[in-house]
From Swiss-Prot:
Gene Ontology CC terms, in alphabetical order: mitochondrion
Cofactor(s) needed for function: Mg(2+)
Keyword entries, A-Z: GTP-binding, Magnesium, Metal-binding, Nucleotide-binding
Pfam families: MMR_HSR1
Residues annotated as binding Mg(2+): 124, 148
Domain EngB-type G per the UniProt entry, residue ranges: 109-282
Disulfide-bond pairs as recorded: none
Protein name: GTP-binding protein 8
């Protein structure tokens, strides 16, 4: 009943929104939250709160602490967050510029979040999924893995800026550490770093470079587990346990709650949008 009432109110909320059927990218059925709210309760939980759904697969009485309720917004909060990611005449979402060094970066006076991860971790796909309600956004993708050598800046209306960092690991640019380290250490309006980890292979040696930088500079960061549609359920549960243990025992600045996502099924995407809207100060949620 609650979901039904919310579906009606959300429908009214977005009745004046932009037409989502046009644009260069094809749309998944679940890009818009109004469609997600039509799902039965169990499927809705799996799509919106994937960590909660995974938690249910552990044996009762021996379930690990996955910090499920640190950020657990209401469905209404998640629906409100979607408006920040929906392009309109009054909310322009667009690629802004690229920079090879911090002193080339635009001097913006709005909150900023950055996405960082190994080459082929699915960073570009995740950013496309986050911006799927703004189909005209041109997400910059290198033709060859690891060849992105620039910081790509995306303007999200008047609300915040999303920065796509060069991928590290395989064939990363030689000056990767200097470029990224300078940005992380000196960018004053950086609110949160989103560190992407492939849920198929877990934390790799190359990931420790980014983790160590975040810890050294005392930066608040979040681990996002990508490609959760790829591994088997058993393998995914194993990876979640291992990564959660790492966060709990080896980190100081990492947000305790993991964010599993799939850019293919949109599982976890709506929750991640809501988290970004919250930590950039644009949406006061009941999540915390």
């Amino acid at each position: 009943m609650a979901a039904h009432r919310l579906r009606q109110s959300v429908g009214r909320l977005f009745a004046m929104g932009p037409e989502l059927g046009s644009g260069r990218r094809a749309f998944s059925a679940f890009q818009a939250f109004t469609e997600v709210l039509r799902l039965p309760s169990k499927q809705l939980t799996k799509l919106v709160f994937p960590l909660e759904e995974l938690h249910e697969h552990f044996v009762p009485g021996s379930r690990p602490d996955l910090h499920l309720n640190i950020f657990h917004p209401s469905l209404e909060d998640i629906a409100r967050a979607e408006s920040f990611f929906t392009a309109s005449a009054r909310n322009r979402i667009e690629y802004l510029t690229s920079a090879v060094r911090l002193d080339h970066a635009p001097d913006l006076h709005r909150p900023e979040v950055c996405f960082i991860g190994r080459s082929n971790v699915g960073k570009s796909s995740l950013i496309k999924a986050l911006f799927s309600l703004a189909p005209e956004v041109e997400v910059r993708v290198s033709k060859k893995p690891g060849h992105t050598k620039k910081l790509n800046f995306y303007k999200v209306g008047k609300y915040f800026t999303l920065v796509d960092m060069p991928g590290y690991g395989y064939r990363a640019p030689e000056d990767f550490v200097d470029m990224v380290e300078t940005y992380l250490k000196e960018r004053k309006n950086l609110m949160r770093t989103f560190l992407l980890v492939d849920s198929v292979v877990g934390i790799q040696k190359a990931d420790n470079i980014a983790i160590e930088m975040c810890e050294e500079f005392a930066l608040p960061y979040v681990m996002v587990l990508t490609k959760i549609d790829k591994p088997s359920k058993g393998h995914l549960l194993k990876q979640v346990l291992q990564i959660q243990k790492f966060v709990d025992t080896k980190t100081q600045g990492c947000f305790p709650q993991l964010f599993p996502v799939s850019a293919m099924t949109y599982s976890g995407i709506h929750l991640l949008r809501c988290f970004i809207a919250d930590i950039t100060g644009n949406l006061k949620t009941t999540g915390f």
